[in-house]
């Protein structure tokens, strides 16, 4: 009995510390998830401001508001910040908040490493953004940083860019290890692998992808560093190297990377469609199998980014075939989402609107991707605005809509307050219209031959560029409404129930709203 009394002080739930130290020292998965989400939103706004500069320059032909050198810095930083600062930290934040609650774990497996993996990120982006103020300007070679533009002809700030990418990679690897260890070791009794929520499955697979490909990116930028400062010739033909080697290494990282940015979105959308259809998700095991297939296939398609570089014909045929194969598991997922909605009791709250838009617009992005997979056609499409339209249709209504859907869906559980449904729907429709007005016309100007990454263009492309820019400003400014909605919700509002949504299933809906600082200190029993 005495042992129980001695340890009694351990039974109290310790709430968060007061003030700034709560956030600096926190090892709580909910606090770290919140930090990731706010950080990602800040980066989303910075990357978005850069996109606004790009679209303002392209509003009319001719040189308008920025120098060509600065334009190139904008397209480089916009891509890097949106991918490594906007989308990825948002999904890691959602993983931190939700994965432990969904599997009945008290926290992440490695809480101190969790803190470290977040707090090195602001430094990485401070270093990256500080390059704007250096002599020679920021990196200007595009987010894919192809050598020799990023080595022989790079501005001096490239060294800071390399260091920044290393820090981001370290953060991603630590976060991914944490997710894998948590999911493999900390599931509550009864939560078998095939009973895990799909968001948890999608993150388990994503984490393995991160662990596999982040070291490849680190290798690529290290070889760049050696070429720039230490006299090697990895990518310098004059010294026996090969610039195409860089492209192979980069895209071996880069293609799994784009799946890292979409697999968690698949998990989120599966949950939301299931909830608002008020029926069980159609084809759970095939959804898991499709996620696994996509992850495996993502490693054997990288050279479809390089069809015009002079690959052997046999390689072009293989990569075309492998890329088209990607459509099969993706089609399975889209079919299952539609089948889940079929004859369901549908209601269209804001999360569901974003999820349905995701399914429709992601499919459009997938179809244009199938066109790009065809080698002879890609010789025409490559490096035109058709490619820009394709990947933005997958990333904006894909990854970003799913993140917004997730925030609307889970914020009542996080904050106990319901968001303003009318404002949420207004935000959805502004975003939906903005995205389509921005990126749909880019298919047309791309097919007509307008190349990417130029601040000026021929007169024939003027009309659609103006339309695209108007859509971009509509989409960009409507995100300020999203910021307002989130702050308003956190500050107060109609109180949510514990379940929040009729039809919501899963362990996270069994805890109180707002989710207590410590959940599942005793593991729940799952049938």
Residue ranges and their predicted role:
Residues 2-527:
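Membrane-embedded and interfacial regions of multi-pass energy-transducing membrane proteins
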């Amino acid at each position: 009995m005495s042992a129980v009394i001695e340890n009694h002080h351990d039974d109290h739930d310790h709430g968060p510390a007061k003030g700034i130290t709560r956030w600096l020292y926190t090892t709580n998965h909910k606090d770290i998830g919140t930090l990731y989400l706010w950080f990602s939103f800040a980066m989303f706004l910075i990357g978005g401001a850069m996109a606004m500069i790009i679209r303002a320059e392209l509003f009319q032909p001719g040189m308008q508001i920025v120098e060509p050198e600065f334009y190139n810095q904008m397209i480089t930083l916009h891509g890097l910040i949106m991918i490594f600062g906007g989308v990825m930290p948002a999904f890691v934040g959602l993983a931190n908040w939700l994965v432990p609650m969904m599997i009945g774990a008290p926290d992440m497996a490695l809480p101190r490493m969790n803190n470290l993996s977040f707090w090195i990120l602001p430094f990485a982006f401070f270093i990256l953004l500080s390059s704007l103020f250096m002599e020679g300007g920021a990196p200007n070679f595009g987010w894919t940083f192809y050598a020799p533009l990023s080595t022989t002809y790079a501005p001096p700030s490239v060294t800071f860019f390399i260091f920044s990418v290393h820090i981001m990679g370290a953060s991603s690897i630590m976060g991914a290890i944490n997710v894998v260890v948590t999911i493999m070791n900390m599931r509550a009794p009864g939560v078998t692998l095939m009973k895990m929520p799909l968001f948890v499955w999608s993150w388990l697979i994503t984490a393995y992808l991160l662990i596999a490909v982040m070291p490849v990116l680190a290798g690529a930028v290290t070889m760049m560093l050696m070429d720039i400062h230490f006299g090697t010739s990895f990518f310098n033909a004059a010294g026996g190297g090969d610039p195409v080697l860089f492209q192979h290494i980069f895209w071996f990282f880069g293609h799994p990377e784009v799946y890292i940015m979409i697999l968690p979105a698949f998990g989120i959308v599966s949950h939301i469609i299931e909830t608002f259809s008020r029926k069980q998700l159609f084809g759970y095991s095939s959804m898991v199998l499709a996620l696994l297939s996509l992850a495996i296939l993502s490693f054997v398609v990288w050279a479809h980014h390089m069809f015009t570089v002079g690959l052997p014909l046999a390689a072009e045929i293989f990569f075309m075939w492998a890329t088209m194969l990607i459509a099969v598991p993706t089609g399975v997922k889209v079919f299952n989402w539609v089948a889940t909605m079929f004859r369901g009791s549908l209601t269209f709250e804001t999360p569901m609107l974003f999820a349905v838009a995701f399914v429709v617009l992601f499919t459009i992005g997938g179809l244009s991707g199938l066109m790009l997979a065809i080698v002879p056609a890609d010789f025409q499409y490559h490096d035109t605005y058709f490619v820009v339209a394709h990947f933005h249709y997958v990333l904006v209504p894909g990854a970003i809509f799913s993140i917004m859907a997730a925030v609307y869906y889970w914020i009542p559980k996080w904050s106990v307050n319901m968001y303003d449904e009318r404002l949420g729907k207004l935000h959805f429709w502004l975003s939906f219209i903005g995205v389509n007005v921005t990126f749909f016309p880019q298919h047309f100007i791309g097919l007509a031959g307008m190349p990417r990454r130029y601040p000026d263009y021929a007169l024939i492309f003027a009309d659609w560029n103006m339309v695209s820019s108007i859509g971009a400003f509509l989409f960009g400014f409507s995100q300020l409404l999203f910021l307002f909605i989130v702050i308003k919700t956190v500050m107060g509002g109609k109180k949510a129930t514990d379940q929040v949504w009729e039809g919501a299933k899963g362990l996270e809906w069994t805890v109180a709203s707002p989710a207590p600082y410590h959940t599942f200190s005793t593991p729940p029993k799952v049938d």
